[in-house]
């Protein structure tokens, strides 16, 4: 069985795409989501997982940094490292073949990545390679750039391998979308991106699992 661990922070719409794909055999015959780990106990994605009998865990950064002043960078870095170490332990307990960051909003640093070197980690980013790296506002930034420059813009989303440099890992699946000035609202473009993300995350998961089993 191919074991998938999914990391989330919010509504879990991309998690739902993976759950639906698993039911339809689109991730591979033996692929199963064995755990969903959320950085927020309020994430609706936890409900989605529970509704589909997928075990869940919560690993929030807040308890680690609570009470530490933002100016105390050394203490915050130490707390962050402890958080990543504990997160890595939770993930490793599941013996994953692949880890999918599906709307996971926290940067995975060296403490986490060094313990998961043998496991491919994928991240969904709502922009093309080299565009709007390291921001959670990539969709709005692309749409506004198109409107401000008043000319068509090719944007989209990608699924890439996670490395220490944020959003700089090798792209696995890229979906391009054309934005035309004045043709759609930000909300309409955002929906197009999300629709493309749901396809991309399934394709990327299937692709990496097929490569692992060659």
Swiss-Prot record:
<dbReference type="InterPro" id="IPR004607">
    <property type="entry name" value="GART"/>
</dbReference>
<dbReference type="InterPro" id="IPR001555">
    <property type="entry name" value="GART_AS"/>
</dbReference>
<dbReference type="InterPro" id="IPR002376">
    <property type="entry name" value="Formyl_transf_N"/>
</dbReference>
<dbReference type="InterPro" id="IPR036477">
    <property type="entry name" value="Formyl_transf_N_sf"/>
</dbReference>
<feature type="active site" description="Proton donor">
    <location>
        <position position="125"/>
    </location>
</feature>
<feature type="binding site">
    <location>
        <position position="123"/>
    </location>
    <ligand>
        <name>(6R)-10-formyltetrahydrofolate</name>
    </ligand>
</feature>
<feature type="binding site">
    <location>
        <begin position="105"/>
        <end position="108"/>
    </location>
    <ligand>
        <name>(6R)-10-formyltetrahydrofolate</name>
    </ligand>
</feature>
<feature type="binding site">
    <location>
        <begin position="12"/>
        <end position="14"/>
    </location>
    <ligand>
        <name>N(1)-(5-phospho-beta-D-ribosyl)glycinamide</name>
    </ligand>
</feature>
<keyword id="KW-0658">Purine biosynthesis</keyword>
<feature type="binding site">
    <location>
        <position position="167"/>
    </location>
    <ligand>
        <name>(6R)-10-formyltetrahydrofolate</name>
    </ligand>
</feature>
<protein>
    <recommendedName>
        <fullName>Phosphoribosylglycinamide formyltransferase</fullName>
        <ecNumber>2.1.2.2</ecNumber>
    </recommendedName>
</protein>
<feature type="site" description="Raises pKa of active site His">
    <location>
        <position position="167"/>
    </location>
</feature>
<dbReference type="GO" id="GO:0005737">
    <property type="term" value="C:cytoplasm"/>
</dbReference>
<dbReference type="GO" id="GO:0006164">
    <property type="term" value="P:purine nucleotide biosynthetic process"/>
</dbReference>
<dbReference type="GO" id="GO:0005634">
    <property type="term" value="C:nucleus"/>
</dbReference>
<comment type="pathway">
    <text>Purine metabolism; IMP biosynthesis via de novo pathway; N(2)-formyl-N(1)-(5-phospho-D-ribosyl)glycinamide from N(1)-(5-phospho-D-ribosyl)glycinamide (10-formyl THF route): step 1/1.</text>
</comment>
<dbReference type="GO" id="GO:0006189">
    <property type="term" value="P:'de novo' IMP biosynthetic process"/>
</dbReference>
<dbReference type="Pfam" id="PF00551">
    <property type="entry name" value="Formyl_trans_N"/>
</dbReference>
<dbReference type="GO" id="GO:0004644">
    <property type="term" value="F:phosphoribosylglycinamide formyltransferase activity"/>
</dbReference>
<dbReference type="GO" id="GO:0046084">
    <property type="term" value="P:adenine biosynthetic process"/>
</dbReference>
<keyword id="KW-0808">Transferase</keyword>
<feature type="binding site">
    <location>
        <position position="197"/>
    </location>
    <ligand>
        <name>N(1)-(5-phospho-beta-D-ribosyl)glycinamide</name>
    </ligand>
</feature>
<comment type="similarity">
    <text>Belongs to the GART family.</text>
</comment>
């Amino acid at each position: 069985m191919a074991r998938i661990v999914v990391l989330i922070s919010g509504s879990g719409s991309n998690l739902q795409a993976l759950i639906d794909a698993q039911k339809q055999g689109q991730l591979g015959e033996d692929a199963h989501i064995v755990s969903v780990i959320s950085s927020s106990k309020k994430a609706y994605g936890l409900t989605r997982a529970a509704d589909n009998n997928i075990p869940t865990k919560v690993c929030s950064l807040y308890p680690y940094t609570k009470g530490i002043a933002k100016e105390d960078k050394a203490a915050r870095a130490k707390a962050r490292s402890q958080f990543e170490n504990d997160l890595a332990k939770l993930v490793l307990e599941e013996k994953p073949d692949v880890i999918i960051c599906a709307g996971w909003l926290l940067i995975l640093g060296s403490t986490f990545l060094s313990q998961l070197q043998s496991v491919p980690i994928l991240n969904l980013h709502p922009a093309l390679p080299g565009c709007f790296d390291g921001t959670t506002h990539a969709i709005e930034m692309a749409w506004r750039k198109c409107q401000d420059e008043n000319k068509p813009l090719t944007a989209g989303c990608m699924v890439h391998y996670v490395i220490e440099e944020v959003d700089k890992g090798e792209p696995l699946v890229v979906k391009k979308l054309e934005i035309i000035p004045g043709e759609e609202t930000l909300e309409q473009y955002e929906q197009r991106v999300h629709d493309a993300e749901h396809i991309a995350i399934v394709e990327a998961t299937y692709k990496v699992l097929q490569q692992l089993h060659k």
